[in-house]
Amino acid sequence: MDPAMELTERKFRHWCRLVESHSGIAVSDCWADFARRRMVEHQSFSRQPEGGREHLQALVDRLLIKETRFFRHPPSFNYVASVLSGDSDVPESDPQSEPPSGFSLWSVGCASGEEAYSLAMLSEQLCQAGKLSSPFRLLATDLSRSALDIARCGEYPRSRLRHLNAMQHAWFESAGDKFLRVRATLKKRIVFARHNLLDSLPGKTFDVIFCQNLLVYVAPTRRKMLLEKLA
């Protein structure tokens, strides 16, 4: 018998509701089988919700697929570059103005850090080109503790960086035969922190908010609310 069948439909839906109320993550039909198996693996379905917050958080961590890579979806990063450099058609930008000083960025749902480090590399490149004034700061947040541990460590398999160009590769140093490590000069630009978007927002404003990894997990009815909250 398929072990995932041991989880009754009623119990499965109950845990889906708990997960969404805790994290905003909606288990849609297209990945319900995956979620069932993760619940069985974690044995969370057999626990009472009272006093089980840590077990619920661990389940949420299992459900987050954490699919990401450096400079994922290049058009998004190209647009950020145009905004930072004042070359976009955003009304607030002024091509004749001085480069922004003290620029701040927020990577929402940064997963294992590739997105945040990509934004940092892009910003450093613009600084070196005189299109953005240092220092800039970057906040990178995620709900997954395990993903944030990887992000803070900043070590990635060499195979994950093969598509980067020479300028981007220069921000890494060797960490053994199979891994590369983000250099401290780039890492110090980023603060990694655990954050749930259902909670209050960080107590500051940001010039750029990047959230392309996040909305896939959120129910359509909640997406508009979150986007308005971020705006």
Regions found by a protein language model. Give the residues of each.
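Extended basic-aromatic, gly/pro-enriched interface segments that bind polyanionic ligands
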Residues: V108, A129-F210, L214-R222
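Conserved hydrophobic residues forming the short capping helix/wall of the S-adenosyl-L-methionine
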Residues: Q43, S123-C127, E155
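Short, well-ordered amphipathic alpha-helices
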Residues: N78-S88, A116-C127
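Conserved AdoMet
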Residues: D2-W106
